[in-house]
From Swiss-Prot:
This is Spindle and centriole-associated protein 1. Transmembrane segments: none annotated. Regulator required for centriole duplication. Residues 1-29, 519-542, 718-783 are annotated as: Disordered. One of its GO terms (cellular component) is cytoplasm. Residues 740-753 have a biased composition (Low complexity). It comes from the Eukaryota. Residues 718-739, 754-778 have a biased composition (Polar residues). The keyword Methyltransferase does not apply. The gene is spice1. It comes from Xenopus laevis. The lineage of its organism: Eukaryota, Metazoa, Chordata, Craniata, Vertebrata. Residues 18-27 have a biased composition (Basic residues).
Length: 793
């Protein structure tokens, strides 16, 4: 296709129609506007402009402004947060990568230190690499031929020796030069071969391991460093080769030493601070010094280093040996197995010994800590058990003391149960003496147990006067009548009046002014043996009096009157035993009568108790001495009556001579009225005998009642002793001691115990007069214990 337009022919042009021309219509001209020159008419006013602004103002203007403000604030906060986040991120990265940074710093410092330490002693040989250009023979076999260049090993330096001593423990002791040379030549020979680049690594290895050491014996040179151009140059040492060698030497950087030399320098830092010099100056100095050194100076420096190193290691070894000896001694003391460590040589052996010793010490510390904890636990357990055992011991001690106290009380009560049953004839003189002391009739016992014990003790100790009373009752002559015969001047009659003139509170119950002393069982048992003998020696009363019922009157209390049949009672007393049935019946009857009396006269017994308490606080020691003298005189009178009555014998045929003699003794007057008096003497004697028998029976009955009441009080409610085993009466024991049974039995026998109290008091006075225990009474008064025995002894 062609882009050339074909020319039109003339024929075509002629045939074409010519376009017709259209005329434009002429527009009418507008009129001229003269206002064009003054356009201010069309200027908008301020109101129109404001209206236009209001019309075209956006409806979201405030929202858009708020969004823009928020965007600005967000960008600002984002910028602040980004800075904070960046700081925290950097801190975190530093914390994470700090170890790596520190490691890099340590490595850099170690590299710098190694660069300085490389030639610390200034005796390291300088190696200069040769560049051989050798034309090999055509028939040369590389496997059988020697290497073209064999670099001998460097002479030993101080640093290399130190490294070998660290790596090999036997190197320190090898000082011999020949051994050291052979050691270096055999074990640590370094062969440096410089061959052509096309030699294979296998061939080089074969040369190093096979033929090289066998064929060549390396000899340590006498000088540590020679002229590099003469000693270690290439075979074809041309000028170009020397220039290349010098350039490469300058370009080489200092290579670090081997690992063994580094370890040796770190472990033996002697002289490091004094010999640290820059690498340049050290190289220059060593170059100048090494040219003038000979082999002898090298040997001396080597020997000094060996001795100094050996001395430091020897010190460490000696110290570790001392530690091991201490550990062995400790093991022997504690009974453990002694572990003998092999002898350590060199620094490696020292480290091994140190680690093993530390391990043993740590194990022993752990074991001792465990033992200490176990001992602490055992001690705590033992302390708890000790507290429990102490509590148990305290409880057992309290129980034993209470049982002992109860046993003492029970034994005292059992002793009181064995009170002897005294015959009436024995009590005749006691009754007469009791009549002379009217102050004793109205008193009552505070507790039945105390009354019973005091009566039993007084009867037991009055055995020395019972013979006189026995003879008086057998003869039928009263002591008053017989005393009038012996003392016609009236002296014996005045002494009973003196006794009766004494106040009634003298013979009342004892007052406790200080803690009493507890008597032992032996004292009670010694006293209890006397009434048994006395009961066997008591004579029986007359048979005519035993069958006659007697009316007993109680003038002291005026509480009751009772008729007692003395036949059965005297028979029982004479046998010394009582039928169980009768004993129980008497026991019940007496207790019933005692309760009946208490119900009938409650105020009278209360008055008596109040009088007793008032009288106990008015005891005078001077009256005690008067009473003692009076009791002694009564004892003498009884002895005289006994001697006189033994001479009088009554018979139905001839009573006149004996009666006349008795009358003359009684009244020594002229014998004008002798026949009339002879007829009156038998009658008066019989009346007196009957009266004495009646009184003895009355006293016997009262004693039996007292014994029954004592048994009843023991059976019903045994009292608790207010006296502690140490012999001290505490205030709590005085307040809390139960006395219900004692007070009850005392109220039951308020009337019956008055007479018995007077009898027991008189018997106790006779006993004290016969024995004469003034020292015991003085001790009792000194201690504040004013018992009845203290008043009459």
């Amino acid at each position: 296709m062609s882009y050339l337009r074909a020319s039109r022919t003339s024929s075509n042009l002629s045939l074409a129609k010519k376009p017709s021309k259209t005329r434009k219509k002429l527009q009418a001209r507008k009129e001229w506007d003269s206002s064009v020159n003054d356009l201010t008419v069309f200027r908008a006013t301020n109101e129109e402009l404001e209206h236009r602004r209001e019309i075209h103002r956006s409806k979201n203007q405030w929202l858009a402004r708020w969004e823009l403000q928020n965007k600005a604030n967000y960008k600002q906060s984002e910028k602040e947060n980004s800075t904070q986040f960046e700081n925290s991120r950097l801190a975190l990265m530093k914390e994470i990568l700090s170890d790596q940074y520190l490691m890099n710093d340590v490595l850099e410092r170690s590299d710098r230190a190694l660069a300085v330490v490389k030639d610390l002693f200034g005796d390291a040989p300088r190696r200069h690499t040769g560049f051989p250009n050798v034309t090999m023979a055509p028939s040369c076999d590389l496997e059988t031929s020697r290497a073209p260049i064999v670099r001998k090993k460097d002479p030993p330096t101080q640093l290399s020796i130190l490294s070998e001593s660290v790596m090999d423990s036997q190197a320190i002791n090898e000082v011999d030069k020949s051994l050291s040379r052979s050691e270096y030549s055999d074990s640590e020979a370094e062969v440096s071969i410089s061959i052509q680049p096309n030699m294979k690594a296998e061939r080089v290895q074969q040369l190093l391991t096979g033929e090289g050491p066998k064929s060549e014996a390396f000899i340590t040179p006498h000088k540590s460093e020679g002229d590099p151009s003469q000693t270690q140059c290439a075979l074809n040492a041309t000028t170009a080769v020397n220039r290349v060698k010098v350039r490469r030497t300058e370009e080489e950087s200092p290579k670090p030493e081997e690992s063994d030399s580094i370890i040796g320098r770190v472990l033996n830092p002697h002289g490091k601070a004094n010999k640290r010099i820059s690498l340049k100056g050290k190289k220059k100095r060593t170059t100048n010094q090494s040219q003038t050194k000979d082999f002898s100076t090298f040997k001396a420096s080597e020997r000094d280093l060996t001795t100094s190193n050996q001395s430091s290691l020897g010190l460490l070894n000696s110290m570790i040996m001392e530690v091991e000896q201490d550990l062995a001694e400790y093991e022997r003391q504690t009974g453990r197995e002694v572990l003998s460590a092999p002898p350590a040589h060199g620094l490696t052996g020292f480290t091994l010994s140190l680690v093993s010793s530390l391990k043993r010490v740590v194990s022993y510390l752990k074991e001792s800590d465990l033992l200490l904890q176990r001992e602490v636990r055992e001690r705590q357990n033992l302390q708890g058990e000790l507290v429990e055992q102490r509590l148990m011991l305290d409880a057992l001690t309290a129980e034993i003391l209470s049982l002992k106290e109860g046993g003492n009380i029970h034994e005292n009560h059992s002793q009181t149960k064995q009170c002897p049953e005294v015959d009436g004839d024995k009590l005749t003189s006691i009754t007469q003496e009791a009549k002379t002391f009217p102050g004793l009739n109205g008193e009552t016992c505070r507790t039945s147990a105390d009354c019973g014990l005091s009566k039993v003790n007084q009867f037991m100790d009055s055995q020395d006067v019972q013979d006189t009373d026995e003879k008086h009752s057998r003869l039928g002559v009263s002591k008053d009548e017989f005393g009038a015969r012996l003392y016609p001047q009236g002296r014996p009659a005045e002494e009973p009046r003196l006794a009766s003139a004494l106040p009634s509170h003298v013979f009342q119950q004892a007052v406790l002014l200080s803690p009493p002393r507890q008597k032992t069982v032996g004292n009670l048992s010694s006293h209890s043996a006397v009434p048994k003998r006395a009961a066997n020696r008591l004579p029986s009363p007359p048979a005519d009096l035993m069958t006659a019922p007697v009316e007993i009157e109680w003038p002291e209390s005026k509480l009751f009157q009772r008729s007692i049949n003395y036949k059965n009672t005297a028979a029982l007393i004479e046998r010394g035993t009582m039928v169980p049935g009768q004993e129980n019946s008497k026991h019940v009857y007496s207790s019933a009568q005692g309760s009946e009396r208490v119900n009938q006269h409650p105020t009278e017994s209360t008055k008596e108790v109040q009088g007793l308490e008032i009288g106990e606080s008015q005891i005078n020691p001077l009256q005690n001495e008067d009473l003692v003298s009076q009791m002694q005189q009564l004892a003498l009178q009884n002895a005289a009556l006994k001697a006189q009555l033994e001479q009088i014998h009554f018979s139905p045929e001839g009573n006149a001579p004996e009666e006349a003699a008795a009358e003359q003794l009684h009244n020594p007057e002229p014998a004008t009225d002798t026949p009339a008096r002879a007829a009156l003497v038998p009658v008066s004697l019989e009346m007196r005998i009957a009266e004495l028998n009646r009184q003895s029976a009355e006293a016997r009955n009262k004693l039996l009642k007292l014994i029954e009441q004592q048994k009843q009080s023991i059976v019903v409610s045994p009292t608790l002793s207010p006296i502690t085993p140490q012999g001290r009466r505490t205030g709590s024991s005085l307040d809390t001691t139960p006395l219900s049974s004692c007070s009850t039995s005392g109220r039951r026998s308020s009337g019956a115990s008055n007479k018995s109290e007077s009898i027991s008091t008189s018997v106790g006075s006779l006993r004290s007069a016969s024995t004469g225990r003034r020292s015991q009474a003085a001790n009792d008064r000194g201690e504040g214990w004013f018992a009845l025995s203290a008043h009459i002894s």
